[in-house]
From Swiss-Prot:
Naturally occurring in which organism (per UniProt): Trematomus newnesi
GO biological process: hydrogen peroxide catabolic process
Residue numbers binding O2: H59
Pfam families: Globin
Binding of heme b, residues: H88
Name assigned to this protein: Hemoglobin subunit alpha-2
Length: 142
């Protein structure tokens, strides 16, 4: 679980990166679709799935807005993300294993884009936060 220190670290790091969420989301989603091509099945209705394409960029921004929303609800992610969990479980039917894949790609992009700020402590706290976020999004699958 997230310690008080982890929560403080996540909030502080988010305040540094939140102005770049469109680029972070685009790169993370682009990487996921290339490195884990099986994830493309969820986006087969898009006209273009190439890295940086308009649909990828738009959905990457949507994802990162969701992450930002989760940061603001860090004290109770499960309750705070009920609606998003229901959407992914019942409407979109996304395999919850994909949350872990996307989380990994978000961490990779953080490391690339913010090498000085993405310290080992930030890495640990963000990894724990994204894992908690993934668990909260998976809540309605049970």
């Amino acid at each position: 679980s997230l310690s008080t220190k982890d929560k403080e670290t996540v909030k502080a790091f988010w305040s540094k990166v939140s102005g770049k969420t469109e680029d972070i989301g685009n790169d993370a989603l682009s990487r996921m679709l290339v490195v884990y091509p099986q994830t493309k099945i969820y986006f087969s209705h898009w006209k273009e799935l190439t890295p940086g394409s308009a649909p990828v960029r738009k959905h990457g921004m949507t994802v990162m807005k969701g992450v930002g929303d989760a940061v603001s609800k860090i004290e109770d992610l499960t309750a705070g993300l009920t609606e998003l969990s229901e959407l992914h479980a019942f409407t979109l039917r996304v395999d919850p294993g994909n949350f872990k894949i996307l989380s990994h790609n978000i961490l990779v992009v953080f490391a690339i884009m913010f090498p000085n700020d993405f310290t080992p402590q930030v890495h640990v706290s963000m990894d724990k936060f994204l894992a908690a976020l993934s668990r909260a999004l998976s809540e309605k699958y049970r």
